[in-house]
Amino acid sequence: DTGEATTRDLFMRMRESIELIVGHLDTSVHSIPPSQKSRPIGLQSRRHFFFAFKEALNNVQKHANAAKVRVVFELTPSHVTFEVSDDGVGFEPEEVKGSGHGLKNFRRRANRVNGQLKIDSIVNKGTTIRFSAPLNHRNL
């Protein structure tokens, strides 16, 4: 692995993960902009972005009791972003603190690539996780 890949490769792997993990749910996938140009992405950004995405999908599968999942991929000249939203049971962030590694892992991954993480959840309404990482971050 040379440490270089493209966002096109990354998004293809992510689409495969959607099918494997939450493909049995009513799933919609959107790209912003709709026809994205492929851009190079550094190894660390790619790794942490992909594993955070899989964690978000696994959380929907394990905890959300959701019927619908919406995934958005967003690409700008400097950042790659995913947003995973579900219509599941949601949670109170205060009640989740210390009860597992999922939220800590999201924060750690965002910090490692100088990225941003936003988690919104409403009990009985669902959860949205938004994770953004710079395309060129390298943790040497």
Predicted regions and their residues:
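Coiled-coil dimerization/phosphotransfer module
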Residues: 1-140
